[in-house]
């Protein structure tokens, strides 16, 4: 069935599945099939921030004084994060919105994707401040072999889903040849592609940022590149929310409470999902090798980062019902939690940009029952 921006068929959105039902018509939020997505939207909106709010002028001085191997670590991570958020700033909208059937999930995907564009703008804000010619950095992203190796794994799941869902929308089920490749398109094969695409996105949000995050926070622990670390802290807070969103979608699918066929597909794809996560973890270990090829930094080295990748991979895989692949069970860099959990840090508002400040998070609804325990 071809995608329509406004279906005129009246339907009960509470009875629609998350995906592959009737396209959303009225964007209504007085009722939700899954209230979690509404809460995620509200939380993301309360997080709203702009990179220009953070003063990164001291970072230019700090960066100039770094030894060459630490400059390599810092700038390489920014390149890699730019790649990840370039993909995430457009792909969820392009791939998922034509398939969504409930308004709260549709709006969550749009809200999520918009926040990713802020992340991309942040990297430009940081890079523009520390180097004289930012284009040298950005131009290297699409030619850097280490970065491109990761880009293919990340983008292929999106690309396959987008291609086949467009074929399905235009022509229905069948076998088609696109760019010399034979594509067998069925509704079930699309559901499988969707599940694996979401699992790939989950791995991206769950693992792929965290080597870079750890390095940024390790610099800040030494009172270096602190403006960058404040921005990365905002980004990490957003990414944790996006991770919660994909975990929730995947767990609903696996439980079969939304679409019984998705539960079958989740079971059928368990090994592929496991392999996908482990491959992402191994790539991040290889990224740590690349970062530290010329030397370590104070408080962080290749071996510590490898242990951290294994630790965090176990946690993320357990959250979506997958077996644990690694022996590492304890966090080798516990100090990172002070950066990843915004409530852990108390600061004076006049001294720094306050990353724990939220907007519109007071519940102003009052019911007569709220006064039942009052006595005069």
Swiss-Prot record:
What PROSITE patterns does this protein map onto? Answer: RIBORED_SMALL
- EC numbers listed for it are 1.17.4.1
Sorted alphabetically, the keyword list is: Deoxyribonucleotide synthesis, Iron, Metal-binding, Oxidoreductase
Its domain of life reads Bacteria
Obligatory cofactor(s) = Fe cation
The record's CDD domains line, in alphabetical order, gives:
RNRR2
Annotated Pfam families: Ribonuc_red_sm (PF00268)
- Catalytic residues per the record? 123
Q: Provide the GO biological process annotations.
A: deoxyribonucleotide biosynthetic process
How is the co-factor bound, per the entry? Binds 2 iron ions per subunit.
Q: Where does Fe cation 1 bind?
A: 85, 116, 119
MF GO annotations:
metal ion binding; ribonucleoside-diphosphate reductase activity, thioredoxin disulfide as acceptor
Q: Where does Fe cation 2 bind?
A: 116, 205, 239, 242
Task: Write out the catalysed reaction.
Answer: a 2'-deoxyribonucleoside 5'-diphosphate + [thioredoxin]-disulfide + H2O = a ribonucleoside 5'-diphosphate + [thioredoxin]-dithiol
Its family remark reads: Belongs to the ribonucleoside diphosphate reductase small chain family.
Described by its record, this protein's role is as follows: Provides the precursors necessary for DNA synthesis. Catalyzes the biosynthesis of deoxyribonucleotides from the corresponding ribonucleotides.
Describe its partners and assembly state.
Tetramer of two alpha and two beta subunits.
> What name appears for this protein in its UniProt entry?
Ribonucleoside-diphosphate reductase subunit beta
């Amino acid at each position: 069935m071809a995608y329509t921006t406004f279906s005129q068929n009246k339907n009960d959105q509470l009875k629609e599945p998350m995906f592959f039902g009737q396209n959303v018509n009225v964007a209504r939020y007085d009722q939700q099939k899954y209230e979690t997505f509404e809460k995620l939207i509200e939380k993301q909106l309360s997080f709203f921030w702009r990179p220009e709010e953070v003063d990164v002028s001291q970072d230019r001085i700090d960066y100039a004084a770094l030894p060459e191997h630490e400059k390599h670590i810092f700038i390489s991570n920014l390149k890699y994060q730019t790649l990840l958020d370039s993909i995430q700033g457009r792909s969820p909208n392009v791939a998922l919105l034509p398939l969504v059937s409930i308004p709260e999930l549709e709006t969550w995907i749009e809200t999520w994707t918009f926040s990713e564009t802020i992340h991309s703008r942040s990297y430009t804000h940081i890079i523009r401040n520390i180097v004289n010619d930012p284009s040298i950095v950005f131009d290297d992203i699409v030619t850097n072999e280490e970065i491109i190796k990761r880009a293919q794994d990340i983008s292929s799941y999106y690309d396959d889903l987008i291609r086949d869902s467009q074929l399905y929308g235009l022509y229905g089920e069948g076998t088609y040849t696109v760019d010399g490749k034979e594509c067998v398109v069925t509704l079930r094969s699309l559901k499988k592609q969707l599940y694996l695409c979401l699992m790939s996105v989950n791995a991206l949000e769950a693992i792929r940022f965290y080597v870079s995050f750890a390095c940024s926070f390790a610099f800040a622990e030494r009172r270096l590149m602190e403006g960058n670390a404040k921005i990365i802290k905002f980004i990490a807070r957003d990414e944790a929310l996006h991770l919660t969103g994909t975990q929730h979608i995947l767990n609903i699918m696996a439980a079969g409470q939304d679409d019984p066929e998705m539960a079958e597909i989740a079971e059928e794809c368990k090994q592929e999902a496991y392999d996908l996560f482990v491959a992402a973890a191994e790539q991040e270990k290889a990224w740590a090798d690349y970062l530290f090829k010329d030397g370590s930094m104070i408080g962080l080295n290749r071996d510590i980062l490898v242990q951290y990748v294994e630790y965090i991979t176990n946690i993320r895989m357990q959250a979506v019902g997958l077996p644990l692949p690694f022996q590492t069970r304890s966090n080798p860099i516990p100090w990172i939690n002070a950066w990843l959990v915004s409530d852990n840090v108390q600061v004076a508002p006049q001294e720094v940009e306050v990353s724990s400040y939220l907007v519109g998070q007071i519940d102003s609804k009052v019911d007569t029952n709220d006064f039942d325990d009052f006595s005069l």
